Amino acid sequence: MKRMTPRENLLHLLRREGYETVPVEFMLCPSLEKSFQEEIGGPGADYMEYFGMPWRRVGELIPEDTDITRFYPYYDEIKDNMEIDEWGVGHESSPTSMHMTKMLHPLEDAEEVEEIESYPIPVYTEEKNAWVKDRVQELHEKGLASVGNMQCTIWETAWYIRGMENLMMDMLSDEELAEAVFDMVEKMSTDRALIYAKAGVDILYLGDDIGMQHSIMMSEEMYSQWLYPRLKRLISKVKEVRPDIIVIYHSCGYIESFINYLIDAGIDVLNPIQAECMEFREIYEKYGDRISFHGTIGTQTVMPFGTPEEVKENVWGNLDIAGEKGGLMVAPTHLLEPEVPWANILAYAEACREYKKK
């Protein structure tokens, strides 16, 4: 019997159609990637290839205008340690920066809708990104699944530009201003998503952090008014173009209160089910017949501070919960940081390879 390619196996698993092998998937911070090359893979080695990971991101889309100097007027000072991204958001780094930077918001002082509407938000076109289709085909020919990455889809992109406190105040007391910000971001994100969909990606990876460690970031009423309908419109347009595309949605933190909204919006897979915030068995029993999952192995607890045996037990236990049909791409819930020992990373990969379906 012909075995499935890594791509076929992953897509079957995420669609809860059974699977042959458990995929290995994780991301390393730069220092861990360096130690991988020094201690395990060799100079220049690709850890995704080394561990046989079944998917690759096709790459970030290129905006029509790549000249970031158009954002300079939104800042009082452009510092040497500051970078401005393609959305115009400033990032100040420091010698101790590992994963995050100090973020500067170009529209934090805006008071009028006209200031939002005149903001030079990036424009993305199919013509500028015709290369995506070739990249998708290249990955598929290698038997790998293709991923269009759009984490920071609506909420995070909007507050990156406006500032979180400002945007939340707008949502409560200046709805016209909030509408202008969200409309601007929704249009840009929809354009990006459609480029990926038309290029034929297997998976569209969306996301906005809408949870905190032990609670949701906003009320259900605010979420259903501001974010849910925009996400649903975006996904609906994508699935009109590519009905079989798999949509994964990322949000750190506790978000159980929002899961039904996400399912109704058209999400197929939820990431990461942060182990320190939510119990996977409970979440699976409530929602596992309608949605699949990616993650579940804690990066605040078992990955950095557990034993290799505990890592394996977590992996096998969660796979047992999901059962033979799949529905769980078991993986660490976040980027692996320097405190995670290689013994635990290798134990995770071994657990995936050693797992026997019950």
How does the language model describe each region?
Residues M1-I40, I84, S93, I116-K358:
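Active-site loop segments of alpha/beta catalytic cores
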Residues G18, F51-R56, D76-K79, H140-K142:
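Short, solvent-exposed loop/edge-beta patches enriched in aromatic
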Residues E33-P73:
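Segments that shape or occlude catalytic/ligand-binding pockets
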Residues T69-Y119, E141-A145:
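A contiguous, low-structure linker/loop signature
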